[in-house]
């Protein structure tokens, strides 16, 4: 029998607030079965599958306890910025997409019976039922408004702790806090008052602004990937590093060094911490905190005696956009409580990028070097590219079965990585 697939788009009334797209099939019990992502390279025993495509610019993602997937889009698709994805026939592929929320953004998180989301200037939450389904998609509570967004690095990543606090990244909109038209850094950097840090707000209070929150940590240029580590009960973040060393300071940095520096860095962050931007950066080659050239540095002078040290460092310009501490049991024991990182860019030094990396942890600290876990999302050899980049990993989530989901914000593909135990 020929498969007949009907695509029905229903704009549901204000009673629900959903835009609903369903795939209906006749005569085929597996009309949209997940297809293997044969180009994605994963370790032995693992497999990658494509469970959804053409989602739009899919940023962060969260999976409910029943397996529903909520994904945040950085641009609206059919007028909606959040989509609930559902596999109704359990064939491994998404066949129902339900859109809601009329704002784009990056952040999304489930905690304490609520779905938390963000736009580039605000934070919202939606009440969930016992199945972690959104009850009133057209009536979110507004938790925070008025966050800085000035056209560069505007995404507001979010995470919620166990004490009803929500943490929000507010990135810098300036690469190094230079005075306009000069190579000199502003001292003190005025951006630090309202950006380049993590702000803490109440997760259960509406209509908050900067004045209601706490600048939890400062000196972080841009954090897109962040997660709450359940083993340490602390916040971990991934910082995007700065650039343009050779452009502004050719007397101190060669083009090669400019491609190698600074490191992308992982920090364990506590209240009052300062990671040092814009005054210093971390050099993973020298393994030192180096004084920024805008503030008197020459590529060798150290600085930041009172700033925190990174717990892990990675090659420059790889763009860490997702961070997830793995707590599942599907993957082998060595992955338990370790950190997965989605890298959204590439390293000129390694000619590698657009990958998911893994850092093993023991007793709440990295216990070994980082490694490539899932690779070749780019779809081309970055050392000798033969075509455009195909996919850019961005968000990470753990499914109720322990599988790992990876979003792609370039072409809107959703991947699921699973492990099959040897028989």
Region annotations inferred by a language model:
Residues 26-42, 155, 172-211, 220-222, ...:
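Beta-propeller domain segments
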Residues 49-74, 319-325, 341, 345:
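Beta-strand-rich domains and repeat architectures in extracellular enzymes and scaffolds
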Residues 51-55, 98-103, 143-150, 214-219, ...:
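Surface loop/turn motifs at the tips and blade-to-blade linkers of beta-strand repeat domains
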Residues 54-57, 78, 96, 103-104, ...:
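Beta-rich catalytic cores
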Residues 63-66, 110-112, 160-163, 227-232, ...:
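Residue-level detector of Asp-centered blade-edge/turn motifs that repeat once per structural unit
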Residues 68-72, 114-117, 165-169, 234-238, ...:
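Conserved beta-propeller blade signature
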Residues 96-97, 105, 121-161, 217:
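Asp-box/WD-like beta-propeller blade repeats and closely related beta-sheet repeat scaffolds
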Residues 397-423:
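Blade-level signature of beta-propeller repeat domains, shared across WD40, Kelch, NHL, RCC1
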